[in-house]
């Protein structure tokens, strides 16, 4: 009997319609297709569950071939300097070598004044992020420190990894930057506190610098929103400065505090707090969260280490010293000569308040001296400055005389052995034989 005959046993009408519309071969393979789909969905669900944030008490840092390590931060160390590593001077060689010695499994690259523009064009040009505004802005900036700050943010956004200034020494392997209680897969930025002095937040000069994260060394994943926010904030800020000064970006003049707040630690800190707050479900994140922290903490997927980690030995902010177990790097500051081109406020008599190094008594005394000076008439101020300059000249002359007298004394001391030979030592005879001594006694 034909299966199409009206007299054949048919079952339900829907089943007949399904058999008529679906080929027999496909019906036979259908269970296999369904099984494959189930397996694919199961695999996808396992991957999804594995990527979900884990409670801290269950989190473990995986081994070399674990899933956490393969999804970790790029194993790349970046630095920038005037010249390539083969042309480094001794002090740059010594600090740079610590990064490769302590981290043999990491790649290492230095961008220089000769290849930085090519890097920016490659990654932010038409074949990269296609941001001609960023490329043009970087091309027009002439201030070395501004370009150095911009470049580190652009590198980290494009490729991620570890960035360190050329005068930073690595004390511990990068693998120790993330404590074991955290899962590396849950983090996308590792930073440290640099200055933790909120008591000075209202000071007219120190206020903007009193609470900041360190940006001479940090670790980031590529595409981090903090890095792009920094680049775009700097672009807008430079445009405003150029407009206010009525000059092109290439000709802007910046003082020390403008650099700090525009591209340096203050700008870095603001961008970090903004991103933390945007990610937070409990309201804005302020510096109170990081004031006086003894250990590291994670906020909005950003690991913040205490001041001792990246900024030990500063003499303030409870920064400890470089011999402690918690100190990860050491900043030598030998490449930090940019303030000479971007001077900070220096009073003609009382100097810079930064020389107080955040000592509260010193800062109060400096403020009082400045207030007393400002209360004088212009003629009195001029006389005070002249008296101070004359006193400095007198002290310089006295110091020079002391130095010359010291040289004469050292020269005479060096020539004295030639003029007065040392006295001859008395001749010492070897001890006599005991038997001979007895004979002499008998005589």
Could you tell me what each predicted segment is?
Residues 149-161:
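Small-residue hinge/turn detector
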Residues 2-148, 164-443:
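Glycosyltransferase-associated regions of secretory-pathway enzymes
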């Amino acid at each position: 009997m034909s299966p199409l005959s009206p007299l054949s046993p048919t079952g339900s009408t829907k089943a007949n319609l399904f058999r008529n519309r679906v080929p027999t071969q496909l019906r036979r393979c259908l269970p296999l297709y369904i099984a494959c789909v189930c397996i694919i969905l199961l695999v996808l669900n396992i991957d999804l569950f594995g990527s979900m944030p884990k409670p801290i008490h269950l989190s473990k840092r995986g081994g070399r071939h674990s899933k956490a390590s393969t999804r970790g931060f790029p194993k790349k160390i970046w630095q920038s300097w005037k010249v390539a590593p083969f042309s480094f001077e001794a002090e740059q060689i010594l600090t740079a070598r610590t990064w490769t010695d302590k981290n043999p499994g990491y790649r290492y690259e230095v961008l220089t004044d000769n290849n930085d523009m090519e890097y920016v064009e490659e990654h932010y040009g038409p074949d990269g992020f296609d941001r001609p505004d960023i490329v043009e802005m970087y091309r027009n900036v002439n201030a070395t420190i501004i370009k150095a700050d911009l470049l580190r943010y652009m590198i980290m956004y494009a490729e991620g990894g570890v960035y360190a200034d050329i005068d930073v020494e690595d004390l511990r392997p990068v693998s120790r930057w993330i404590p074991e209680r955290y899962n590396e897969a849950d983090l996308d930025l590792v930073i440290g506190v640099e200055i933790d002095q909120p008591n000075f937040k209202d000071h007219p000069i120190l206020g903007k610098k009193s609470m900041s994260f360190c940006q001479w060394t940090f670790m980031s994943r590529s595409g981090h929103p903090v890095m792009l926010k920094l680049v775009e904030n700097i672009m807008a800020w430079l445009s405003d400065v150029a407009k206010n000064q009525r000059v092109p970006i290439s000709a802007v003049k910046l003082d020390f505090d403008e650099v700090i707040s525009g591209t340096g630690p203050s700008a870095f800190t603001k961008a970090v707090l903004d991103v933390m707050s945007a990610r937070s479900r409990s309201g804005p994140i302020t510096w109170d969260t990081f004031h006086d922290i003894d250990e590291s903490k994670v906020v909005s997927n950003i690991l913040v280490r205490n001041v001792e980690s990246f900024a030990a030995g500063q003499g303030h902010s409870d920064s400890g010293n470089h011999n402690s177990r918690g100190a990860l790097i050491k900043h030598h500051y030998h490449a930090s000569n940019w303030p000479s081109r971007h001077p900070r406020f220096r009073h003609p008599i009382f100097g810079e308040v930064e020389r107080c190094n955040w000592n509260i008594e010193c800062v109060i005394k400096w403020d009082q001296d400045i207030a007393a000076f400002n209360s004088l008439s212009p003629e009195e101020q001029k006389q005070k400055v002249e008296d101070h300059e004359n006193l400095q000249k007198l002290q310089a002359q006295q110091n020079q005389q002391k130095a010359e007298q010291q040289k004469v004394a050292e020269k005479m001391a060096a020539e004295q052995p030639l003029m007065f030979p040392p006295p001859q030592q008395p001749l010492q005879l070897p001890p006599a034989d005991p038997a001979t001594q007895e004979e002499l006694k008998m005589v």
